[in-house]
């Protein structure tokens, strides 16, 4: 087991945001977190990364408990994150945005370095955009940069928050293919997503998150057959 959360509870003031969330991600697996906006998907991702502190529960990564470990140490141990808003610096080139991760990976004890050619294999379009300023990129291009910057950390688990949001069908297809290539590199993915069809393209399994609870777990095919989930997922 690569990642496991055990009964995570998270509050914002008196609001109970996550309720006893337990989930697992195996090595070389793509797992979806499916649910409506505000269901708690992003909060799960941020608890795993250490940006949010759960009130109770445990987080295990590669067999070690990381519940109270700093975000920096979690990243150094093999977690990486591409946020929904991409956070590409507009005045920096694509090359400079990606290489922001270099100083972190140099601290990794395993000595691994990022192979830029692997990044181009995942998103071939980036080769032509390498010197372009971040402020001159489309939304889809910014997300490519954000994911590549996360991959520059040489993670074991990539956390993606709404990576398909706002993308055209063509770009969604490119991203779906990219996720398959990322898994072929031996990297697992935990993907927060509101669209079942997009998740079904890439995920081995998915958890349905509703009002902070994981109410169902199964393959995308199994989820599609559950009529009771239609209202939750807006199908």
Predicted regions and their residues:
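ABC-type ATPase nucleotide-binding domains, specifically the catalytic core motifs of the NBD
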Residues: 13, 92-114, 122-124, 218
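Conserved ABC ATPase signature
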Residues: 133-137
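Helix-to-loop junction immediately C-terminal to a conserved catalytic motif
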Residues: 49
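Conserved ABC transporter NBD signature motif
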Residues: 57-65, 77, 111-116
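The feature captures the beta-strand-to-loop junction immediately N-terminal to the Walker
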Residues: 34-36
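ABC ATPase C-loop
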Residues: 150-151
């Amino acid at each position: 087991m690569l990642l496991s959360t055990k009964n995570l509870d998270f509050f914002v003031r008196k609001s109970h945001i996550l309720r006893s969330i337990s989930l697992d991600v195996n090595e070389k697996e793509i797992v979806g977190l499916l649910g409506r906006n505000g269901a708690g998907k992003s909060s799960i991702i941020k608890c795993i990364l250490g940006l949010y502190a759960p009130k109770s529960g445990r987080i295990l990564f590669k067999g070690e408990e990381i519940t109270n470990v700093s975000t920096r140490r979690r990243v150094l141990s093999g977690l990486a994150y591409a946020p929904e808003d991409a956070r590409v610096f507009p005045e920096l080139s694509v090359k400079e945005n990606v290489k922001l991760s270099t100083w972190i990976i140099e601290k990794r004890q395993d000595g691994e370095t990022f192979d830029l050619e692997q990044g181009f294999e995942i998103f071939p379009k980036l080769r032509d955009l390498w010197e372009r300023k971040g402020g001159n990129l489309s939304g889809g291009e910014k997300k490519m940069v954000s994911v590549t910057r996360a991959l520059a950390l040489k993670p074991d688990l990539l956390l993606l928050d709404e990576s398909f949001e706002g993308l055209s069908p063509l770009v969604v297809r490119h991203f779906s293919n990219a996720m398959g290539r990322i898994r072929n590199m031996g990297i697992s993915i935990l993907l927060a997503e509101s669209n079942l069809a997009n998740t079904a393209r890439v995920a081995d399994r998915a958890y349905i998150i509703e009002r902070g609870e994981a109410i169902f777990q199964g393959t995308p095919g199994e989820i599609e057959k559950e009529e009771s989930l239609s209202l939750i997922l807006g199908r």
